[in-house]
């Protein structure tokens, strides 16, 4: 991870990050987050089946996840939610519930399950060096395949499959959209397209952009120092010469937004841009056949 990206993730007001992230998948989050931001969105579980689940990866590892879906319904469109660098904490769970309230089955796998607990690291640098950098892309993408399979066995319609991801998960969303032709669409929130290559991260999304399998909506902040605007211009150029299905990809850059402008639990949150991006996300999934708002069987 590049230094500007690490810097962009450090909040500019004091709060106990470990305590905050420790509230993963639903316990104790609201009390600690409200001291950070009164703007934080809390979505209830009324009418939903929501909570922690687990499933086996291809290598037999048990992968924990958070899922939310309308109670008692099947044949649901599926959204895979890829977590930020901080792992599956309550903000990511809340995003799943927001999708579920609109009729989706949304599931967020813990893609750090083998390497460790993101809440245990007291600094961004330690989190990156001791956990995130040790997570191989190939493993992550395989675990997302397993997540998709689980969703198909638990009420999801895999003919209506989308993916979205934030920050670290935005980069992973790019890579998965370059991998899985069965996706209908993807939405990337401030996911970088270039970065340092390592044995665990051998390719950047830009390197594979000519193989993009689905249309992607990219949502970025112009003030995000971790994502150079010229890298987005390069990405657009490569996509324009790639498969026809991907040429409809769109990039939206918000002039006054920093990194993590959707993260309503952090000082980086920009309400107007976040709401616009969310509306665009829902429209994107509708337009590309993930949802037509006429879905779901059962009461």
Kindly label every feature range from the protein language model.
Residues 15-29:
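N-terminal export leaders
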């Amino acid at each position: 991870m590049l230094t500007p990206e690490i810097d962009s993730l450090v909040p500019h007001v004091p709060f106990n990050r470990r305590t905050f992230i420790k509230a993963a998948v639903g316990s104790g989050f609201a009390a600690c987050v409200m001291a950070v931001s009164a703007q934080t969105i809390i979505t209830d579980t009324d009418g939903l089946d929501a909570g922690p689940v687990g499933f086996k990866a291809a290598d037999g590892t048990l992968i924990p996840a958070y899922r939310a879906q309308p109670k008692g319904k099947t044949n649901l469109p599926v959204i895979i939610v890829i977590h930020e660098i901080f792992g599956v904490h309550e903000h990511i769970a809340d995003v799943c519930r927001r999708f579920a309230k609109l009729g989706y089955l949304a599931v967020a796998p813990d893609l750090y399950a083998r390497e460790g607990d993101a809440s245990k690291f007291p600094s961004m640098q330690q989190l990156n060096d001791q956990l995130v950098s040790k997570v191989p892309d190939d493993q992550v993408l395989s675990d997302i395949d397993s997540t998709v399979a689980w969703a198909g066995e638990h009420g999801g319609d895999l003919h209506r499959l989308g993916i979205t991801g934030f920050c670290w998960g935005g980069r992973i969303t790019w890579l998965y959209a370059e991998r899985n032709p069965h996706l209908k669409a993807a939405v990337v929130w401030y996911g970088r397209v270039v970065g340092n290559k390592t044995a665990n991260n051998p390719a950047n999304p830009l390197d594979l952009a000519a193989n993009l399998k689905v249309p992607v909506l990219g949502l970025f902040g112009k003030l995000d120092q971790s994502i150079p605007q010229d890298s987005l211009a390069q990405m657009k150029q490569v996509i324009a010469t790639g498969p026809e299905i991907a040429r409809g990809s769109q990039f939206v850059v918000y002039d006054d937004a920093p990194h993590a402008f959707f993260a309503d639990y952090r000082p980086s949150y920009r309400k107007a841009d976040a709401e616009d991006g969310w509306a665009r996300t829902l429209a994107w999934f509708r337009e590309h056949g993930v949802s037509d708002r006429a879905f779901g069987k059962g009461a």
